[in-house]
Structures are given as C-alpha cells and as structure tokens.
Amino acid sequence: MMNRRREKELELKERRVQRVEREDAAGKLVERVPDLTSVSISIHETRAGGCTSDTHYIRRVVLEHAPALFEVSCSDPRCEDGGYDVTQEIIRALASRQARFEGQQACQGRCGSIDCSRVLRYVTTATYQ
C-alpha cells in the first residue's frame, strides 16, 4: 500500500514538472497577444449525453503571470491521462481580437477500461486596448 501511494506521489510530481515545462515552452500570454487587457473563461464540463456530475466555473486569467497555455484537467477522479488542451483555439481567437468565442472538446482519457465520456464547453470573453 505504501508503494502505491509513493508511486502516485511521484506521478503527481512528474506531472507538475511537465506542466511547468509546457508553460515555459508556451511563453507568456501578454507576449503573444500584447494588446489584451482581460480574459475570462466560463467552463462547463458534463458527461456526454447527460447533465449528471456537471462542473461549472469561471476562470479569470491574471495576464501579468499567465502562460500562453490553456489546459483544463478532467474533473472525473477516475479519469487517467485525460483533460482538455484548448490552447490553439483560444490563442487563435485572441490573436484575431475576438471579444467572445466558444468551443467544446471531448476528454481523451480513460476511466478503467472505457473512454472517459466528459465534454468541456467553454465561452471566452476578452477585451483589448
């Protein structure tokens, strides 16, 4: 039991290191979109085909510190290797100065032997100079 716990801790630490590396490689958001003054993302995650176990929150981006990386973890605790990377869609929309845009993406993770069935829907609002 202790070995399994230790393995989980090491996996978590490795994921954090990988996340920092991806953030560093992405650069800063204000460098990619210099005239951006605010960004908020309304995130709504559901199971495909249903409304059970919904997750809904608003992510307000702190521009001074934000990497040009938009990854969201899957909220299903059983999901392995899942989550959503909406970086390209959001950066593309911000670079073209869109004030409001939305999108969705299915989780690519697995819950045991089956595919994760969660879907992320997001609405982003942005302001520019």
What are these regions (language model features)?
Residues 39-63, 68-110, 117:
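Short recognition patches in nucleic-acid-associated and regulatory proteins
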Residues 1-68, 121-129:
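Short, intrinsically disordered terminal segments enriched in charged and Pro/Gly residues
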Residues 107-129:
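Terminal low-complexity interaction tails
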